[in-house]
């Protein structure tokens, strides 16, 4: 399903849905969004998720931003995101680090730092 719907992300950013495809095998919508943010930084994942929820009527816990790519200085970002039918499917398919990233939590990397090792 090809679509050109507009999505208002913030006062300084607006997006256009370039591709909205239903993947019935997995149970999700796969959306490609082009975001125009001239003169401002790349919109946050949370802002993009909120805008998609308002525009498409989904739930926040079912939306995952897969990728945001911005060319330096261009003011245009390409966003890939998925909207799932259920949280169970989302948790089976998407990597945990993406779920943590969209939730705004940071994972601690393994290993200890800060004087624990023997220094000479």
From Swiss-Prot:
Residues 101-120 are annotated as: Disordered. Belongs to the eukaryotic ribosomal protein eS24 family. The keyword Nucleotide-binding does not apply. The keyword Nuclease does not apply. It holds the Pfam family Ribosomal_S24e. It comes from the Archaea. GO terms for molecular function: structural constituent of ribosome. One of its GO terms (biological process) is translation. The lineage of its organism: Archaea, Thermoproteota, Thermoprotei, Sulfolobales, Sulfolobaceae. This is Small ribosomal subunit protein eS24. It comes from Saccharolobus solfataricus (strain ATCC 35092 / DSM 1617 / JCM 11322 / P2). GO terms for cellular component: ribonucleoprotein complex; ribosome. Keywords: Ribonucleoprotein, Ribosomal protein. Disulfide bonds: none annotated. InterPro entries: eRP_eS24_sf, Ribosomal_eS24, Ribosomal_eS24_CS, Ribosomal_uL23/eL15/eS24_sf. The gene is rps24e.
């Amino acid at each position: 399903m090809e679509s050109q719907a507009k999505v208002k992300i913030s006062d300084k950013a607006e997006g256009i849905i370039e591709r909205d495809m239903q993947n019935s095998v997995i149970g999700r919508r796969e959306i490609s969004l082009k975001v125009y943010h001239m003169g401002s930084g790349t919109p946050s994942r949370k802002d993009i998720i909120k805008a998609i929820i308002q525009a498409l009527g989904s739930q926040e816990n079912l939306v995952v931003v897969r990728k945001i790519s911005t060319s330096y200085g261009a003011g245009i970002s390409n966003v890939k995101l998925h909207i799932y039918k259920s949280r169970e499917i989302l948790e089976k398919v998407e990597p945990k680090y993406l779920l943590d990233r969209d939730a705004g939590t940071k994972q601690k990397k393994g290993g200890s730092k800060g004087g624990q090792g023997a220094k000479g």
